[in-house]
Amino acid sequence: LKDKFSFISSRISYSELKFIIKTLCIIPFMIIHVPNKNTLIIDDFKLRCCIGKKGLNYNKKEGDYSTPKGLFNLKKLYFRKDRIGIPKCKINKKVIKRGMAWCDDTEHKKYNEEIKTRHKSLKENLYRKDHKYDYIISISHNERKIPGKGSAIFIHLTDSYEPTAGCVALKKKDFEILLKLIDRKTKIKIG
C-alpha cells in the first residue's frame, strides 16, 4: 500500500491530491499543517509563521522552548474585543479580559488551563500590553494536564517572526485568513 501511495503521489500535484482526498471525503475536516519552522499551510494558503526557538519536538517539556509535534484539535479562540472587535469564525470564542491567565505551574491543580491572575501560581497573562495575544487559539496539546509536558501552547500573533517559547505565531493579516477557513472540526498538524 505504501508503494502504491508513493507511486500515485509522485505523479500528481499536492493540489490534485488534496482535491481527490476532499472529493472522496477521506478527511472530513480541514487540516492546518506546520511542516517546518516558518511555514503554515491551510487550504490553498501558504503562510509565513514562527515556532519555538528550539524547533519541533515529539517530547515537549515545560519551558524547553520547543513546539510540540503532533495532530491537535483547535479548542477555542480568545480575543481582545477592545482592540479588534468581535471576529467572525466558526469555533468557540471568548473575550480576553483583565485578570485572565493560563496556568503553567506544574505543581498546581489548574496546570494547563485558563485561570484568573489572582491565583498564586506561575502563569501566562492573557491580557497584555503588546498585541501578541490580541488573538489566541488554544490547541489540545497536553489536555490530560500531565505536569511538565507543556502548557499554554497557542496559535497567536507576531509582529517580527522572532521564535516563540513553543507556540505557533502568525502576522495579524494571516491569522485573519486562518479564522475565515477554520471550523470546529479543523485540526493542526505540527511537524
List each model region and its residues:
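Low-acidity, Ser/Thr- and Arg-rich intrinsically disordered low-complexity segments
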Residues: 2-19, 25
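Cell wall/extracellular polymer interaction/catalysis modules
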Residues: 27-165, 172-191
